[in-house]
Design a protein with these regions (language model features):
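Short, flexible active-site loop motifs that bind/organize anionic cofactors or intermediates
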Residues: 45, 116, 130, 139
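Structural alpha/beta surface segment adjacent to cysteine/selenocysteine redox centers
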Residues: 50, 56-129
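Extracytoplasmic thiol/disulfide redox context detector
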Residues: 2-87
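C-terminal cap of thioredoxin/glutaredoxin-like
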Residues: 20, 131-191
Length: 191
């Protein structure tokens, strides 16, 4: 009798359990695949914006995923530049990347915007966040205005058309497959 009830329960629940991801629903295949940094690894590219509340809420789940990601998976962050006002924070990201201070500045910058509700609209305010985290002012100034940061920000601006994005956060796998929280059914299901 117990086996019979178990079988009935499984039959009732089975349609609710998804077997996998469906193209066109959970993700889309990019019409023009993009090259990855290292073709020998699976690349997961996150397109984000510091001012995006959805990106902020994805961060804890993303951090947990990163702690347990397989060794053959490379994770790359790219700040999206979907408008002129997004450029300042994209340059902030590339500044922290080039200075090697991502781990100490990334989360505090998100928290200034989303927890403390600060509007970051000037280079001076961005610099203050970096300095608060132990970055020297002259290092920030030199890097923020560098050719490398300007070039990387320009490439990030092109991502809008290359990946066909209209919002963030977005994950692109191996330069071929794009998903978002909206497509996948939530932040957790993106990962």
């Amino acid at each position: 009798m117990k086996t019979w009830f178990t079988l009935i329960a499984l039959l009732l629940v089975a349609p609710l359990v998804r077997a996998g991801f469906d193209e066109g629903t959970d993700y889309k295949r990019l019409a023009n695949p993009q090259p990855t940094v290292n073709p020998d690894q699976i690349e997961v590219l996150e397109l984000f914006w510091y001012g995006c509340p959805h990106c902020y809420h994805l961060e804890p789940q993303l951090s947990a995923w990163l702690e347990n990601k397989p060794d053959d998976v490379a994770f790359v962050r790219m700040p999206a530049v979907l408008g002129a006002d997004w450029e300042l924070l994209a340059r902030a990201y590339y500044t922290m990347e080039l200075l090697g201070v991502e781990e100490q500045v990334h989360r505090p910058l998100l928290e200034h915007i989303h927890k403390q509700r600060k509007r970051i609209r000037s280079v001076d305010y961005v610099k203050a966040v970096f300095v608060e985290q132990g970055v020297q002012e002259q290092d920030f100034d030199r890097t923020f205005e560098s050719f490398a940061v300007i070039t990387k920000t320009s490439r990030a601006r092109q991502a809008r058309s290359l990946y066909g994005i209209t919002g963030v956060p977005v994950l692109v796998v191996n330069g071929k497959y794009l998903t978002s929280a909206q497509m996948a059914g939530g932040n957790k299901d993106m990962l």
